[in-house]
UniProtKB/Swiss-Prot annotation:
This enzyme is involved in the de novo synthesis of CTP, a precursor of DNA, RNA and phospholipids. Catalyzes the ATP-dependent amination of UTP to CTP with either L-glutamine or ammonia as a source of nitrogen. This enzyme and its product, CTP, play a crucial role in the proliferation of activated lymphocytes and therefore in immunity. Pathway: Pyrimidine metabolism; CTP biosynthesis via de novo pathway; CTP from UDP: step 2/2. HAMAP family: PyrG. It catalyses: UTP + L-glutamine + ATP + H2O = CTP + L-glutamate + ADP + phosphate + 2 H(+). GO terms for molecular function: ATP binding; CTP synthase activity; identical protein binding. CDD domains: CTPS_N (cd03113), GATase1_CTP_Synthase (cd01746). Transmembrane segments: none annotated. This is CTP synthase 1. It comes from the Eukaryota.
Length: 591
């Protein structure tokens, strides 16, 4: 097993996750099995109770793990399925050690950060690195570990010490450290400054880790003189200084690393069992990046949500929209609309914001209402849903978005004026959305219906069934406490709101479609968590197709992706060029 540790310096949020994912991508393109671990030095057990404003979205895994959004990057880039133990937090490791102490495993010893916490970290990493994450079930050969935060943070000290010891435990030829640092370029001088990187590497080396690669994040490509300066002061060769400058799309980052000889370096440094050959998977990334840069037509989607001021709150939703837009050869324009701005109360208090929000909504090609919690902004979302329904605008509601679509339909079509979710109005006489039986009140963490669940299609001719390739069932990830009241199903269906997908027991409403509408769909699950760049999520893909007016034509042609549209580079084909000529997204004609 080979371990690659990715650390960060100067500031957080400079793209360690994308760089770690890109390193995994180029290694996977060489035919290796790659897994990933994200370490977050906060004391929370998991990301389940985080505010989206503070930490971005909560990413949900197959096993129901609520984890950091960086694990979403790993899954999308590498097309793997991770588990909750691939996200290690200070809280998890302390809980693990304290539980062992309570059981008497330490035989009365004084339990300390060193050696007990640091040993537990190393054991966790070595154990988790061996868990298969690919569909073929084979054991990984490389584990990419991202240490969150920045070097020098007091929270990350136990992890730095653990990896200082770890590099000797697994031997130098099996361990490599990539340090990601910022090279700022003040506009006043236009000169690239290396001092922050020098200080960051000096601090890391003082803690016992010496970087093998220094990855410099910068606005523009590094000058040769700057590269040589970093090489001299950071104790690395010039070819070990890697420049990752701002690029048009993140699809270019793996290509950027490949061009600078990162694979050749790993080949020598870690003695990896790979051959120098043309790599099909990277060709697919290059093809995607080139397509992305050549897009001319634009499709605009109004994202009506509660957390629109911080785009990371909807990271996977945005990625799913981007994947689908690329598949239909359109640039994506997302119009972020704070749902409270659409409410009548805003018209009285801030009329300019109200009219600007409605202007954005009316000018969009399609409307998306994503998941969320809490009553604030729900009436604005209902207003947007009502507008999309009446104006025949393509609409997709995800989780809360689906629930509010049912509330809107109940109020404005069935005439139940007080129809609501019991989450917002426990005393409503028409509880169209109710608390779930699985929910255990009183404890915030882990009380929802989480993880991958199966949904069965109830009819042969629904739009969603066709988008999923005319299959009998689908498996998607869930994260919700409330659901559509099954008692009211008949009343809603009689008026044209069809529940075309239900759970295995037939008790939970999973997919809803409105008759006589170009595309009005609600899903209780979160399809964005399984969207991939080459395999866009069917609900989002349907929304984009409908938004550009091509859905009917696509449904007539049949909806299967090419079997070659996968990430696997272990197909045994000796002709990557022939595969690349067949790389095609879902077939869309220009009419």
């Amino acid at each position: 097993m080979k371990y690659i540790l990715v650390t960060g310096g100067v500031i957080s949020g400079i793209g360690k996750g994308v760089i770690a994912s890109s390193v995994g991508t180029i290694l996977k393109s060489c035919g290796l099995h790659v897994t990933s671990i994200k370490i977050d030095p906060y004391i929370n057990i998991d990301a389940g109770t985080f505010s989206p404003y503070e930490h971005g979205e909560v990413f949900v895994l197959d096993d129901g793990g609520e984890v950091d959004l960086d694990l979403g990057n790993y899954e999308r880039f590498l097309d793997i399925r991770l588990t909750k133990d691939n996200n290690l937090t200070t809280g998890k490791i302390y809980q693990y050690v304290i539980n062992k102490e309570r059981k008497g495993d330490y035989l009365g010893k004084t339990v300390q950060v060193v050696p007990h916490i640091t040993d537990a970290i190393q054991e966790w990493v070595m154990r988790q690195a061996l868990i298969p994450v690919d569909e073929d079930g084979l054991e990984p050969q490389v584990c990419v570990i991202e240490l969150g935060g920045t070097v020098g943070d007091i929270e990350s000290m136990p992890f730095i010490e653990a990896f200082r010891q770890f590099q000797f435990k697994v031997k130098r030829e099996n361990f490599c450290n990539i340090h990601v640092s910022l090279v700022p370029q003040p506009s006043s001088t236009g000169e690239q400054k290396t001092k922050p990187t020098q200080n960051s590497v000096r601090e890391l080396r003082g803690l016992g880790l010496s970087p093998d690669l220094v990855v410099c994040r910068c606005s523009n490509p590094l000058d040769t003189s700057v590269k040589e300066k970093i090489s001299m002061f950071c104790h690395v060769e010039p070819e070990q200084v890697i420049c990752v400058h701002d690029v048009s799309s993140i699809y270019r980052v793996p290509l950027l690393l490949e061009e600078q000889g990162v694979v050749d370096y790993f080949l020598r440094r870690l003695d990896l069992p790979i051959e120098r050959q043309s790599r099909k998977m990277l060709m697919k990334w290059k093809e995607m990046a080139d397509r992305y840069d050549r897009l001319l037509e634009t499709c605009s989607i109004a994202l009506v949500g509660k957390y629109t001021k911080f785009s990371d709150s909807y990271a996977s939703v945005i990625k799913a929209l981007e994947h689908s837009a690329l598949a239909i050869n359109h640039k994506l324009e997302i119009k972020y609309i704070d749902s409270t701005d659409l409410e009548p109360s805003t018209l009285q208090e801030e009329p300019v914001r109200y009219h600007e929000a409605w202007q954005k909504l009316c000018s969009a090609h399609g409307v998306l209402v994503p998941g969320g919690f809490g009553v604030r902004g729900t009436e604005g979302k209902i207003q947007a849903i009502a507008w999309a329904r009446k104006q025949k605008k393509p609409f997709l509601g995800v989780c809360l978005g689906m629930q509010l679509a049912v509330v809107e339909f109940s109020r404005n079509v069935l005439g139940w004026q007080d129809a609501n979710s019991t989450e917002f109005d426990p005393k409503t006489s028409h509880p169209v959305v109710i608390d779930m039986p699985e929910h255990n009140p009183g404890q915030m963490g882990g009380t929802m219906r989480l993880g991958k669940r199966r949904t069965l299609f109830q009819t042969k001719n629904s739009v969603m069934r066709k988008l999923y390739g005319d299959t009998d069932y689908l498996e998607e990830r869930h994260r919700h406490r409330f659901e559509v009241n099954p008692v009211l199903k008949k009343c809603l269906e009689e008026q044209g709101l069809k529940f075309v997908g239900q759970d295995v027991e037939g008790e939970r409403m999973e997919i809803v479609e409105l008759e006589d509408h170009p595309f009005f769909v609600g899903v209780q699950y979160h399809p964005e968590f399984l969207s991939r760049p080459i395999k866009p999520s069917p609900p989002y893909f349907g929304l984009l197709l409908a938004s550009v007016g091509r859905l009917p034509h696509y449904l007539q042609k049949g909806c299967r992706l090419s079997p070659r549209d996968t990430y696997s580079d272990r197909s045994g084909s000796s002709s990557p060029d022939s595969e690349i000529t067949e790389l095609k997204f879902p077939s869309i004609s220009q009419d």
